[in-house]
From Swiss-Prot:
GO terms for cellular component: centrosome; nucleoplasm. This is Ankyrin repeat domain-containing protein 7. ANK repeats lie at residues 58-87, 91-120, 124-153, 157-186, 190-219. InterPro entries: Ankyrin_repeat_domain, Ankyrin_rpt, Ankyrin_rpt-contain_sf. The gene is ANKRD7. It comes from Homo sapiens. Testis specific. Signal peptide: none annotated. Keywords: ANK repeat, Repeat.
């Protein structure tokens, strides 16, 4: 899962808030947007060979780079210049995805206010909601839901935002998503539900939280027998704490 939301640094590259940038790959316009140099950006756009929607070798526009680096003034200026808001880069990521991925909430808010689509998917079918959940930002998740982001969107692995929260062991996010109506019985491509994924991870409080939501007690997606037994034990412990406690004492006495 972590590989879906991580960025790998190559030789001669510098990290730039979610984009690995090499100077030789950037046009002057893109470099200005990346560093937030609004004055230079305006100067370049007055030259005919530069266009507000110009893409680099990886199909990134100035808006992508400004959003990735949190330059709200540049974002507002580019939108005023009628730039495309839902344009995609080489990984199918929109400027909104980059803003959320890099946790630049102000940039994300601006884009949403100007009609950015919260349900566009990147090359792995992740939406902005997947990235917001992975970034553990409750405020971003709440904002995206206000703009009707799809709470049940699945990426290529079949993970909904709720499953991402469970995999990342984030009880607060799990509880928040459930309160917002997330399907507690949604499953991934291997038929693993939130409960099954929670049993195999930490902390165990996630299991209790999910069981309190009336989750379906199905363990068909658990291939490992040891994990299956753990699943059954934890369910029994939640449902019949007195029985399991006394059973454990008898076993220990023997």
């Amino acid at each position: 899962m972590n590989k879906l939301f991580s960025f790998w640094k190559r030789k001669n590259e510098t990290r730039s808030q979610g984009y690995n940038l090499r100077e030789k790959d950037l046009k002057k316009l893109h470099r200005a947007a990346s560093v937030g140099d609004l004055k230079k950006l305006k100067e370049y756009l007055q030259i005919k060979k530069y266009d507000v929607n110009m893409q680099d070798k990886k199909y990134r526009t100035p808006l992508h780079l400004a959003c990735a680096n949190g330059h709200t003034d540049v974002v507002l200026f580019l939108i005023e210049q009628q730039c495309k808001i839902n344009v995609r880069d080489s990984e199918n990521k929109s400027p909104l995805i980059k803003a959320v991925q890099c946790q630049n909430e102000d940039c994300a808010t601006i884009l949403l206010n100007f009609g950015a689509d919260p349900d566009l998917r990147d090359i792995r079918y992740n939406t902005v909601l997947h990235y917001a959940v992975c970034g553990q930002s409750l405020s971003l998740v709440e904002k995206l839901l206000e703009y009707e982001a799809d709470l049940e969107a699945k990426n290529k692995d079949g993970y909904t935002p709720l499953l991402v929260a469970v995999i990342n062991n984030n009880p607060k996010m799990v509880k928040f998503l459930l309160e917002k109506g997330a399907d507690v019985n949604a499953s991934d491509n291997y038929q693993r539900t939130a409960l099954i994924l929670a049993v195999s991870g930490e902390p165990p409080c996630l299991v209790k939280l999910l069981l309190q939501q009336g989750v379906e007690l199905c363990y068909e997606g658990i291939v490992d027998s040891q994990l299956r037994n753990m699943f059954i034990s934890m369910v029994l412990l939640h449902r019949y704490p007195q029985f399991t406690a006394s059973h454990g004492k008898k076993k220990h006495a023997k």
